[in-house]
């Protein structure tokens, strides 16, 4: 990302560490958010003092032309403003996609309609009890991208991944776990088929050396 202009959409909890990481590496960052400067309060001043540009308000997605655009997890990648930016040459990505690219250790990821957080937490606790150094994150805990510099190859990253995070993923974890599938988030996904397709991305890019675990008691995952 060096020498590239970067836009980060959303200045929420999940993206603030990403913004600060990019700024710490002297990358040109524009943070975009629907909130007003008044709503952001002191956070707006803090980011600007670190060299971050702000693009705020109802038109926060207008005119995106940065080299790389990080979308917030719950945002569809095919919004007209984003597809227009991609057509102009921007690369659309997310914090989790970049994490998969740079994380030096093996990754275990959990998705599903129910039980994701419980399953992810149990896996992390079992590995810790076995003496492993575990990094817990994704849709649970806190963003892990800023911690990759301190991760070792022998560590394990345990991740909870939502359908929104998985929609555009081009990488899969070493171990993928799907708890179950049932109609969910259809206010964002076009239909149940798209929701299932997003979930399938957790194992789509696995190799013969990787492991996929499914719930045989769920009619959809059993197929």
Where are the regions a protein language model picked out?
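Phosphate-binding loop of NTP-binding sites
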Residues: 61-66, 73-223
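N-terminal leader/targeting and accessory segments in enzymes
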Residues: 1-94, 98
